[in-house]
């Protein structure tokens, strides 16, 4: 069973489709998913320290910049976690994010790629391996969160 932490840095308390939708997809695979909006909730250090996959939703430039200290924090807490960033600004900042230690960067319709990443990590059992599926543009079916 994969423990997944999804983080939003810029929702400011609004419902985040960028967390809710992938949560529904990932829970269908049996993953244990915890979501956090760090603008309204305390960062879950205990879960981050044991998560297999930690992923940041980056829908805009500000969210990307705000994610940086949390990426560094997770690297310090859990060097074994696979770090991922997804969303419109993730792929625009691929070089910057991978320079910070992010292993997977997803753009476009990211839900199915997150599911593929979890399957890849379950199969490989090596969270340090990069996973680079590219940008998914196909139309995806909506999952009810």
Spell out what each predicted region is.
Residues 1-145:
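Acidic, low-complexity intrinsically disordered segments
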């Amino acid at each position: 069973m994969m423990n997944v932490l999804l983080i939003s840095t810029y929702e400011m308390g609004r419902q985040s489709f960028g967390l809710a939708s992938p949560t529904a997809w990932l829970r269908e695979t049996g993953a244990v998913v915890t979501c956090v909006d760090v603008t309204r909730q305390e960062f879950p250090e205990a879960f981050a320290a044991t998560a297999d996959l930690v992923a940041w939703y980056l829908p805009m430039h500000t969210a990307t910049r705000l994610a940086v200290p949390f990426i560094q924090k997770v690297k310090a807490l859990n060097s074994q976690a696979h770090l991922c960033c997804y969303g419109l600004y993730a792929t625009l900042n691929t070089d910057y994010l991978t320079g910070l230690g992010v292993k997977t960067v997803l753009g476009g319709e990211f839900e199915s790629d997150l599911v593929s990443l979890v399957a890849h990590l379950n199969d490989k059992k090596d969270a340090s391996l990069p996973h680079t599926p590219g940008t998914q543009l196909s139309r995806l079916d909506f999952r009810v969160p």
